[in-house]
């Protein structure tokens, strides 16, 4: 008989991806709309993916 396992939280699975080293990759916020006041440089930096902190990674990997 199979053991009970925790189901994947789909909201977390859609927002984060796991890198080869086990870190969580995420997108930056504040890019969808109302970005006219932000400079081009600031918007360009938000384009790149970010790596989550190690303390948050432990919490979110349980959901995946």
From Swiss-Prot:
Gene Ontology biological process terms in this record: translation
Pfam short name (any one): Ribosomal_L35p
Gene Ontology molecular function terms on file: structural constituent of ribosome
Record's keyword terms, sorted: Ribonucleoprotein, Ribosomal protein
CC terms in the record's Gene Ontology section: cytosolic large ribosomal subunit
Family annotation (NCBIfam families): rpmI_bact (TIGR00001)
Family recorded in the similarity comment: Belongs to the bacterial ribosomal protein bL35 family.
HAMAP family the UniProt entry points to: Ribosomal_bL35
Name of protein: Large ribosomal subunit protein bL35
């Amino acid at each position: 008989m199979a053991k009970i396992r925790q189901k994947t939280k789909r909201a977390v699975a859609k927002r984060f991806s796991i890198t080869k080293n086990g870190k969580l990759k995420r997108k930056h916020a504040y890019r969808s709309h109302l970005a006219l006041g932000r400079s081009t440089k600031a918007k360009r930096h938000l384009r790149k993916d970010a790596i989550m902190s190690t303390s948050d990674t432990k919490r979110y990997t349980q959901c995946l």
